[in-house]
């Protein structure tokens, strides 16, 4: 699969072009929503704010900073949005799923504005088609590791000096818990329950609180790491994973954790290994070894087993399905003979 093409388009200079009036309108909407759901201020709303900035830069450059509430915008909204879709495709090289999210970001602003009485109608509601096939579009590679590959990583992390104890912990806890990287980045010493081998009340996607469970080996690593931390920051930083910046220890960012995961993937010769691959590997491994899809869904904090089935279980080849059918038939025949 081809590498994802990254474009740095939205520089400080371009963002400075955004109309102050348009910025003021969106900030009012954003603050209103943050008040209702502060838990996702630095996650979901940060993404939406960034996407809206991109749209406002587009308006500044292509539509002379047209006012978001102006009659001209209302009249030309469909043309504006279709042009923005083309811009996202041709200039930013966004995939379909990202483009749909960007459209939803703008649409949500107008839905709020309509409820508040700032406008009389939504300018493009039901007039635009969402990008089709977004869910089927493969954006990044997914790797489902087998036992041999998982063991190779675990053993290499123990012996290769270029990896440290935090690398071991990230790999081990992610594999044990099958949690998202967002939860892993928020692990704290205060939330740690060593006796029950779990981190409690960790805020994850959209502010939901989850548990992050781990096994015996991870427990050993955590104990070792906490002893080391006494000599580093005397456990003053509550975050489990830390980095040193400007002479001070602070919480390790999600981006730094992902960089470490990418480095771990190089053990297997994978240069595009990402945190979600570990999550998928863990959940798929549960299903393969237990045959219980609901158990995998529960571990993944999924509300529906269909989410687990469609996105976290390794698709079987026709040959694998055939072999499975043959084995099932053989078992049925053996059972009949015994009867």
Where in the sequence are the language-model features?
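C-terminal secondary-structure termini that scaffold catalytic or DNA-interacting sites
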Residues: 1-11, 326-339
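N-terminal core-binding DNA-recognition domain of tyrosine recombinases/integrases
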Residues: 27-140
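Long, amphipathic, Lys/Arg-enriched alpha-helical "connector/arm" segment
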Residues: 91, 135-163
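Basic, Lys/Arg- and aromatic-enriched nucleic-acid-binding interface segment
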Residues: 151-181
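C-terminal catalytic core of tyrosine-transesterase DNA break-rejoin enzymes
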Residues: 172, 279-302
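Short, polar N-cap/turn motifs at the start of nucleic acid-interacting alpha helices
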Residues: 192-194, 271-272, 291-311, 334-339
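Catalytic-site neighborhood detector that most strongly recognizes the C-terminal catalytic loop/helix
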Residues: 203, 300-326
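C-terminal catalytic core of Y-nucleophile DNA break-rejoin enzymes
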Residues: 204-224, 237-260
